[in-house]
């Protein structure tokens, strides 16, 4: 975490911050994303990320800014506009690039820093704007089922922010009732 800029960034082999910080640069130290996206990839410790950022209020401010920042970009080491960049610009949600998987969980981080209504607001905005039964009702691509899994979990009202951990962040369900049929005849009802 680069405190001077408030984002994740990379260091060189000697431990010095890499020159020319640009939060909108895709590629370089990041795969299919920029510092705007990968800063939130502390799935296992959102509270620790909040501490790095100076507490809940600065983290909320940074998350808020992701949705309203200009959707400008620097194609960086890719040398051209990859489809993930084009999708972020077309979706027009600031630096939030929902069509690209590395940042999809970030909406749920509001749950961890005391503002779950912002999780609910952004979830509904994304689900209503980017998913439908029409020919353009599915944004981005499908890396190993992540985008559809994000939608299914979010539509049910919860999401595994940290894969492999037995906990879920609460969202805003689209359904009044969902029943998951589990092994041995058990049901989980939301």
Regions found by a protein language model. Give the residues of each.
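Active-site core of glycosidic bond-cleaving carbohydrate-active enzymes
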Residues: 3-174, 178-189
